[in-house]
Amino acid sequence: DLYFAYQEPDNKAFAHNFMVLAPSGLKTSIIPSLRTIQEFDPSWVIPEPAASNLRRMLKFEMLDENRSANKSNRTKNPNVQKIAVHEPLADLFGLVAVTNAEKVILDRIDKSTDGLFDFHDESEDEKDRVANELRNKIGKLPHLSILIDEVHHVASSNSDDEAKLRTVVNRWAANGSITTVLGFSGTPYLDKKEKVEVTAKHQITMTEMSNIAYYYPLANGIGNFLKVPKVISTGSNVRSEIVEKGIRSFFDTYKDTVYSNGTCAKIGIYCGTIETLETEVYPLVSQLCQEYGINPSEAILKFHEGNKQYPEPQGARAEFATLDKPFSKRRVVLLVQIGKEGWDCKSLTGIILSQEKDCPKKMVLQTSCRCLREVANARQETALIYLNAQNYKYLDEQLQKQQHITIEQFQQGRKQEE
């Protein structure tokens, strides 16, 4: 968009600025992942020297501030200030802003008695004013493309979020500033079947989102920009047996693996519940680490939100955010209700799903793929996926239904085309 917009600045077909929206429920894993947009290399798409020229034009803002900035002279909304620094907005070119859709864009919008949404435009309430201030400022961004990540969360939502978002975008579009609205999803499926009317007497139902415009096959990414996976089903459904086999296989293969960027190979274990993590998985993994000469206190990261019996592990949130840094010495990441989608940890080299409910049934494929992002060269990098018999079956079913490939083809990726 930026390349062609630079050639034809008055052509409304091409965006000058971009707003990336992430779902609220996934902010812990999604927002940090979206920060990697800053590392994108324009030469992946555009040849030099145009690529370097585009990189110099890019401006990146994370609109992630939740509290008012009391000392600001321009605004009491720090997210508005991040946009205001780029004024005059009419001439703005190359802004990429990332924000949490529900918490920021959809904040302080209520449904009135007539079923319409009330933006409280005339309200004197400070929170209403602050929320509208940001929406109004975004609405002034010229030639804006809106990119909605994990869009299936909006489409499948039982709340009014999708309708709210459409209402907000329509408001912006009324100003003539919206170029495109694009949604992205690795799992474009609805929670409930959608009825599509074909004629007055005929309709079809589908669980797949009906407005998919472009599809990129997973198999094309394997060995291209995704690690080559090895999928193993233990044939057992005993958690301890599966975890032990998975950890032993991981340490036997990747114990000494340090990637070219200085990060060490890691494995994620999805535990289902906090109690399972604390009482079953952690003691077992700790014992195995000691057996392999690895210090458990340095190697194991427990990450969950805590409960009455087991509080959230101190410092875990910060450590989770820095797992992909060379200074992180964590090798095993124990997870409860996080990291199933959108988690960007390139040094994650394996995952274990030892029980059926360690992740939702419909997300076995997506969770299994968490360990596939390449570090430097996907052709030379491998990953380990350890599953119990039931999750192996779910993975096979989802690959065939969603990607039209078998587990064997999944493990071959681009090799099957060569």
Spans of features found by a protein language model:
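Conserved Walker A/P-loop ATP-binding site and its immediately adjacent core
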Residues: K12-L58, N100-K103, C271-E278
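Conserved C-terminal RecA-like helicase domain
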Residues: V45-K76, V80-Q81, A90-L95, D107-I109, ...
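Catalytic P-loop NTPase motifs of RecA-like helicase/translocase cores
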Residues: V154-S157, L190-D191, E374
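Interdomain helical connector at the RecA1-RecA2 junction of SF1/SF2 helicase-like NTPases
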Residues: R166-C289, G413
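Conserved RecA-like P-loop NTPase helicase motor core
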Residues: G306-I407
